[in-house]
């Protein structure tokens, strides 16, 4: 038996909005420690990792490990029927083929039940090794979203470079080029407005902007975003989900064509 009750139902709606365009079908894994998802996008370029820890739920019952295959588009349609202030409860029986979403209004004068069929989804669980990153940038999430959106009007690849001077986002396209430089800034009134750059080694890596723009759909979840970069590893773009977990997006860097030509 599985029963999860989330008072901040809007969190779950925002989580779905931030992953449904990348991943069509995925398994939600429930264990005693939390509710999680790990899935590749359809073109196997990006990986999404979600964790909502059990202690963040008002009520969390998971008698045994359960994996529920869901179509995220359909799940999102159901969650859209919940009001932003609604309490959301997720229920499923062990071995059952459906999951029930229950939406309760804050005054508890309206309760809606939506039942959705589960799917059988084959998914390999990819071990994500803990790594030491050469550079880590923490910045306001809406600023990162704006940069990705602005650069997409010029080009389709962003080069993220971290040096002693700061972090530079640049692109080039048919109409010209664009460079946006952010310097470390911790003298701010609100901690979420700070730009913090931890650089162990300088890095410069290229990424597809359409994926970066997709990742920024998680902006409503968190005021800050953390970008971890290393020359040999995929970038990690992480958004915290309230105090209860995170969404992490992993994206492999693009190999520049001219480097391939040299090889």
Swiss-Prot record:
Q: List where the protein spans the membrane.
A: none
Q: Which InterPro entries match?
A: DNA_clamp_sf, Pr_cel_nuc_antig, Pr_cel_nuc_antig_C, Pr_cel_nuc_antig_CS, Pr_cel_nuc_antig_N
**Subcellular location(s) per record:** Nucleus
Q: Name one GO molecular function term.
A: DNA binding
Predominantly, its location class is: nucleus
Q: Does the keyword Transcription apply?
A: no
Q: What keywords appear on the UniProt entry?
A: DNA replication, DNA-binding, Nucleus
Cite the Gene3D superfamilies for this sequence: 3.70.10.10
Keyword Nuclease: yes or no?
A: no
What is the protein's given name?
Proliferating cell nuclear antigen
Species name: Brassica napus
């Amino acid at each position: 038996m599985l029963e999860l009750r989330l008072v901040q139902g809007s969190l779950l709606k925002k989580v779905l909005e931030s992953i449904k365009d990348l991943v069509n079908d995925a398994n939600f894994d429930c264990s005693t420690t939390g509710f999680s998802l790990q899935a590749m996008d359809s073109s196997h370029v990006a990986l999404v990792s979600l964790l909502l820890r059990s202690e963040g739920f008002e009520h969390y019952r998971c008698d045994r490990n359960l994996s529920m295959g869901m179509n995220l588009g359909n799940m999102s349609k159901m969650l859209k029927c919940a009001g932003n202030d609604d309490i959301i409860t997720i229920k499923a029986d062990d071995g059952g083929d459906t999951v029930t979403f229950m939406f309760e209004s804050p005054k508890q004068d309206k309760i809606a039940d939506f039942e959705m069929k589960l799917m059988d989804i084959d998914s390999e669980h990819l071990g994500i090794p803990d790594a030491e990153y050469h550079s880590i940038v923490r910045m306001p999430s809406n600023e990162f979203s704006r940069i990705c959106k602005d650069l997409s009007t010029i080009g389709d690849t962003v080069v993220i470079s971290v040096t002693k001077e700061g972090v530079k986002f640049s692109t080039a396209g048919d109409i010209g080029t664009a460079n946006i430089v952010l310097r470390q800034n911790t003298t701010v009134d609100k901690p979420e407005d700070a730009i913090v750059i931890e650089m162990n080694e300088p890095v410069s890596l290229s990424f597809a902007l359409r994926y970066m723009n997709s990742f920024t759909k998680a902006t409503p979840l968190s005021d800050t975003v953390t970008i971890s970069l290393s020359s040999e590893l995929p970038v990690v773009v992480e958004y915290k989900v309230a105090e209860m977990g995170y969404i992490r997006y992993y994206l492999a860097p693009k190999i520049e064509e001219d480097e391939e030509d040299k090889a």
